Amino acid sequence: YLSYAISISTVIVAILGPVLGAVADHKNRKKPLFTFFMMMGVLGCAGLALPSGIIAFLAVFVIAKVGFSGSLIFYDSMLVDVTTDERMDEVSSQGFAWGYIGSCVPFVISLGLILGADQIGLSGTAAMMIAFAINAAWWGLVTIPLLRNYKQNYYVESKGHITAKQSLSQLAEIFGEIRNDRKVLLFLLSFFFYIDGVYTIIEMATSYGKDVGISDTSLLLALLLTQIVAFPCAILFGKLTKQFETGSLIMVCIGAYFCVAVYALWLDAA
């Protein structure tokens, strides 16, 4: 059922994404749209802490996932507004690195609650519910500095209220330009298949791990270790962009990712 919920949320974002992106290109639109989807994700995450049946839980999960994925549409595009082309790789890698290590704070707290639930008089379900609430609160709090300081510097000038027709017209124009630019078209197609595979592995890794016999505790610790290892690696690759082409480094990472994924495919037991 989890895979169906993930697929539904992905389809929703895929449909909304191009239109939302076109709207966000206009002046002072990016931050409000980001805030809306971020709050949808935060409230959805908090909603997962409420007791409910499997269907209600999955419905709230879809809302949270759409909020999270939708917010990334605008969050990722903010990079051009906060740095220069020369520093883009470095700033991006620093953002990923500190995001990875920062996420360990609520993760460790939640992990302590879940693994030590019996010692502090909590049921496993109660500990999990509190963990969802903690992560929702953390998500909302760490977004405040961005909301206070971000300013959209690059935008499309528009006269008056932006209509859906204008956004669709702009979108059609963009698609026309993409169709006539072979490099951009190939890049977008490649990125679509690449990122779809990456996110599928990330989101289904724990389910796959359970199927091959890895315990819940081991899976949680593995996820935590992944975040910790990702911190120095992100910084390292940011520095390597000064010595090597970004495209070459990306190919190295994709190659390593592919090898690990193929190896995992043949696992039949932990």
Model-found features: residue ranges?
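Pair of pore-lining "gating" transmembrane helices in MFS-fold secondary transporters
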Residues: 1, 62, 176-201
